[in-house]
Amino acid sequence: MVKKLFFIATLLYIGATVSAENYLVKSPDGKIVAELNTNKSLSLQFKYNGSILLQESSIGVTLNDGMDMGKNPKVASHKLSNHKETIHAPFYRQQNFETGYQELNLKLKNGFGIILRAYDEGVAYRFYTQRKGKTIILNETAAYQFGKDKKAWLPYTTTPEKPFAMAFQNIYHETRLDTAKQDLAFLPATVDCGKAKVTILESDLEKYPGMWLKANSSELDKEKGILRAAFAPYPKEMAYYPWRHMSHVKSACDYIATSTGKRNYPWRIFAITEHDTQMPTNNLVYALAAPNKIGDTSWIKPGKVAWDWWNDWNLKGVDFKAGINFETYKYYIDFAHNHGLEYIVLDEGWYNSKEGSILKPIDDIQLPKLIEYGKSKGVDIVLWAVFNVMDENLETICKTYADMGIKGFKVDFMDRDDQTAIEMVERLAACTAKHHLILDLHGIYKPHGLNRTYPNILNYESVFGMEECRWTEAKNDMPLYDVTFPYIRMMAGQVDFTPGAMRNGTRDNWKAIYTKPISMGTRCHQAACYIVQDSPFTMLADTPTNYEADEPYTRYIASLPVVFDKTIVPQGEIGKYIVTARKKGNNWYIGGQSNWDERTLTLKFDFLTDGDYEAIVLKDGINANHDAEDYKIEKSVINQKSELKIHLASGGGFVIKIIKK
């Protein structure tokens, strides 16, 4: 629900005879000024506290009839207005938040228009068209000019030979723009402009491909530090891989989208943050997304999950053969029940994925019996599926499994973000919501606010998460990544990082083991993921028998909430460390993580209300630099005037539960 309060606004209407000029919008606090220039071409620039962050940058949309919004724009009218909103945000990092903006609606001739907004948190624009019939969009142009000496954090495609076909999982490359690779980079991406950082995102992506960025497309781009937009072309012909019945683009058209002539285009967002600690809680993507389309959300249950795939179904000391069978999943359900976890996920293997026979569960799991057993223990079941396999028989699959008692799907292997992929995800979101099924989206592009529109989408992957520990190389520095992506990727939305490793490695002794994976960094670094990361549907990724071997630690992480009333980041620096504090009811939860550098932090608790609190601290043990599994639990009484020094080992972390007395 959105409550819009429109206060006195300056409304300025200018007729069709207006000459080309500049149009300004200012953020409510006056720090951000964005300017649209309509002289010969359409361009955007903006300043923060008087310093130029984005230099004059050309933008536009080209249609197949030859119309180009960015060339020789003719202004028909413009309207300037001011707005405030209070946004209710279920299953988000804030239960509610307020935002305000100044908006320019610039109507152009020939059925084009652009909306530009300035928030205290950044700048956003979107195109719109008001034309008859269908429209084919040849391309959208954007040449964001920052300056060649600016530093950027770019996540490149992992398949340069076929750049748009990938899982959107890569580390961030920290680089100057003029020395950046020419490979395509997916969003979000951040540029350090000196006075502030600018993070490029998008929201309300509907019937349209996702945006990518490319540096150094030409010598001119290199000289000016331009990041140029790119988009996956519209698919012409699809084919299937011989495994998982997974579809892929075999050939593509020479345009990026096909649509109706009357529509809004996606929001292009520049989140502006003076301090790194503002980055993980920037709300622009959520604020700019289309509001809730499904109505009642009381049936949606966030929670923690006992998961099979990461630990390779490894159970120790049991009297049955562990694997994809009833007895194994019964054990997972018992573990979930005994530790207060809401779900288990049945990952790949519960049906013959090569055949795509999703309506035929394998006999060994006895799915109806397993569902009934889960019900008796208060544990619900979520099923894994491949996107296109589910989409090809969507209504039947949703109804069949909802009627059976399944509560959701973990849908995997989209591996593209062309227009048809975007449309497929929305179809899945709408149909699963109709049948009261939740979604956890894997192998997918970054969030773009669809979780606001369809709140049954509880999580997204699009992260270099814990699965990488099964096969990656040590050079892909995960502790570094873990204190980088919360500042950048999490601006886009929640993240299914799948933490919880009980086998933990130091910088010197970590290695990839596919069947018995080890995390990089300490066990407390893993625990901190549950607080640092926005994740309302989150895994306990290791095997139940590993957790049962350390009940104090397991019960500690199992007791942590997954949704919160408020989130702040009191301390942190991108690529070095992060400290996140979240409020739930009268209690607070703090999580902190470091890169491979040891550090000692002084924590203050001035965000607490009056009174005493019990602080239950989970922290790296004295020998955690040698044995990353070493930890300690301590208790003390604190109040809002207290300070606490806490040491983080190399790749370390901590969690504090702060319980009101």
Residues covered by each model-derived region:
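Aromatic- and carboxylate-enriched substrate-binding clefts and catalytic-loop regions
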Residues: 347-522
